[in-house]
């Protein structure tokens, strides 16, 4: 056994220069764990509450309150618990908070402790983090969804769709997938430069130029893929995140960059047009988080053909996912640790999805740190897909580098699933 001896939290900064929580956990055995908590820009209204100070400093975004919750409430209550009992630690956190949305302790405080405990457990047991989280069957390296062109809330430009991603589905292994993605990323930079467009990057490391339309973004990406000798639709597929909740106001979806206001039916028609003309295999948050009727129609339209990922729709919450399953809405869930606040609840959401034929996409947040925890989580759960930005900015690359290290550890036993990740599609 390895008993928790001390837990300490401090205020640090994320990739956007906003305060966030760092937690360090010490045990009597000497095993140590840490965590650096991410935060989102386009956040779902149903996410667990992130505790912020609301004072003048840092525009109200300070996290001293969250750190105090760790240092003065959580820590003293968890001292003496066995760090290898993750579910017991997370249950204690939930009981201590006592609310449905973590508004007492804050999901950022709770998650920091939960992640740090998992790491300390791995160190004590002398096992890789991914094996502690998932067991000896953890061996699948994920397809990266690389967000190489940014819009929406992730960029200061006129592009409405928030993320345009590439997926190297025909790579031989994870390292090969990284090579393909990196080569396409650099080719896209040259394509944009040749057109006299900006090559500055957005929150997630992708380029963020002003463009005439969302289709133009896809055209530039197709050009970049072909420039380095890969075949769109065969070796590389595309994915988009519309983050439609950010576009939704007054029963319409407002695409300001294109000067359009669309109904849910018209948004579905827009996606149909994109899917027919570009090799798009995955659409995330195509409609607003509470537009269940619209989501039902979209699922009926694309079921079995396109991966329909619920991010703001499901917020890594088993209650909302259960409703989606019962109503046959979407076919995939985006997994963000800080949407729910504990490792155990996150694993439960992934397991529920898997049992009901939904895929899981492990995801970062736009406000990231250099903590690569989600890389281990992706392998632990054999999710088959990870979304952690472009291959630029160390807050993104840290996750890719960790996956490279894991792939070396699992040499000879790991698998890169390719199209097998879309096991619920007719492809």
UniProtKB/Swiss-Prot annotation:
It comes from the Bacteria. The lineage of its organism: Bacteria, Bacillati, Bacillota, Clostridia, Natranaerobiales. It catalyses: (2R)-2-phosphoglycerate = phosphoenolpyruvate + H2O. PANTHER family: ENOLASE (PTHR11902:SF1). InterPro entries: Enolase, Enolase-like_C_sf, Enolase-like_N, Enolase_C, Enolase_CS, Enolase_N. This is Enolase. Its main location: cytoplasm. It is an enzyme of class 4 (lyase). It is found in: Cytoplasm; Secreted; Cell surface. GO terms for cellular component: cell surface; extracellular region; phosphopyruvate hydratase complex. Belongs to the enolase family. CDD domains: enolase. NCBIfam families: eno. Pathway: Carbohydrate degradation; glycolysis; pyruvate from D-glyceraldehyde 3-phosphate: step 4/5. One of its GO terms (biological process) is glycolytic process. Catalyzes the reversible conversion of 2-phosphoglycerate (2-PG) into phosphoenolpyruvate (PEP). It is essential for the degradation of carbohydrates via glycolysis. It comes from Natranaerobius thermophilus (strain ATCC BAA-1301 / DSM 18059 / JW/NM-WN-LF). The keyword Manganese does not apply. Binds a second Mg(2+) ion via substrate during catalysis. Its EC number is 4.2.1.11. Keywords: Cytoplasm, Glycolysis, Lyase, Magnesium, Metal-binding, Secreted. GO terms for molecular function: magnesium ion binding; phosphopyruvate hydratase activity. The active site is at residues 204, 336. Mg(2+) binds at residues 241, 284, 311. Transmembrane segments: none annotated. Its cofactor is Mg(2+).
